[in-house]
Amino acid sequence: MTEADLTGTEAVRKVALVTGASRSVGKGIACALGSAGWTVYVTGRGPVGVDGQLDRTAGIVTERGGHGIAVQCDHRDDSQIRDLFAAIAREQNGRLDMLVNNVWAAPKGFAGFTEPFWQRPFEDWDSLIGVGLRAHYVASVEAARMMVPRSTGMIVNISSFGTRGHLHSVLYGMSKAGLDKMAADMAVELRGTGVTTLSLWPGLVKNEAMLARGLDNFQGFPLADAETPEFVGRVVVALASDPDVNGRSGSTLITAEAGPEYGVVDVDGNQPISHRSVFGGGPLFGG
């Protein structure tokens, strides 16, 4: 897939919301959608209009040929999520073609997943489940209310191999497993509406924090085989461009496996490696 294949036009500009897009996977997805000519709303907790990380993401979307719109939103607050969707509906005449549920919040005092669950405070639930699962459900409800009347749309959850094997922490795995089940069950209730739900498992991602550490590998995984945030975005664009994607609704897909299926390579031309064998298998729902 070439850059030309990803480019859209103003006349057919679609509308996406990518939550948690200040950096890493969310930023990569937003930028790839920008290359495809989408209008992309990007959210984060940081202020907008001050040349912060969220503004820079929106700026890249626009530079790529899309239209980036930065919106400050604390996804722990249902009312802010509702206001966000109301603004999109008002500004885009009710149109929303894609929601990417990506926002994540670290627990209070987080310094890495270094302690077993019984040594962590109960408040971890509020971040890892409250934002990492509940906020995605709230956003999905609001998105479905916009998409179903138009008989089209896609809801994408950014999940993890932590669904399949232990990764990071108990609550992290619980939240990701919940996202996969949410996509599967939403697909059942959305059947016949034209709205597609998917969950994605990126592998090891070469994000800003990972690269800043200057590592050659992370917990045994070579960074040379890892994927960039924008690779995940290119897979999302490819799925959105598939006219038969609704037939996959409810599935969980591994990005490193979906990429070759759609002819998607990473920004450096490499093909990331799937971690399926490392975690003892693939997704429980499709894939």
Residue ranges, per PLM feature:
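Active-site loop of short-chain dehydrogenase/reductase
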Residues: 13-14, 66-67, 94-96, 147-160, ...
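Canonical Rossmann dinucleotide-binding motif of NAD(H)/NADP(H)-dependent dehydrogenases/reductases
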Residues: 8-45
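Rossmann-fold cofactor-recognition segment
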Residues: 61-78
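Conserved Rossmann-fold SDR core element
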Residues: 95, 180, 190-205, 244-253
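Catalytic loop of short-chain dehydrogenase/reductase
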Residues: 105-109, 116-124, 128, 154-192, ...
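A short, exposed helix-loop element centered on a Lys and neighboring polar residues
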Residues: 140-141, 184
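C-terminal helical subdomain
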Residues: 199, 219-287
